[in-house]
UniProtKB/Swiss-Prot annotation:
Pfam families: Ribosomal_L36 (PF00444). HAMAP family: Ribosomal_bL36. The keyword Ribonucleoprotein applies. InterPro entries: Ribosomal_bL36 (IPR000473), Ribosomal_bL36_sp (IPR035977). GO terms for biological process: translation. This is Large ribosomal subunit protein bL36A. One of its GO terms (molecular function) is structural constituent of ribosome. Belongs to the bacterial ribosomal protein bL36 family. It comes from Actinobacillus pleuropneumoniae serotype 5b (strain L20). SUPFAM superfamilies: Ribosomal protein L36. GO terms for cellular component: cytoplasm; ribonucleoprotein complex; ribosome. PANTHER family: 50S RIBOSOMAL PROTEIN L36, CHLOROPLASTIC, LARGE RIBOSOMAL SUBUNIT PROTEIN BL36C. Keywords: Ribonucleoprotein, Ribosomal protein. PROSITE patterns: RIBOSOMAL_L36.
């Protein structure tokens, strides 16, 4: 899980979702998991 000011899709499997006001990236590749913080 990477915590970043700006989250971006890193590959075509990445999806940007908003959960409880937090922007997250979910992906089949665990290295691509991110959240905004």
């Amino acid at each position: 899980m990477k915590v970043r000011a700006s989250v971006k899709k890193l590959c075509r499997n990445c999806k940007v979702v908003k959960r409880q006001g937090v922007v997250r990236v979910i992906c089949s590749d665990p290295k691509h998991k991110q959240r905004q913080g």
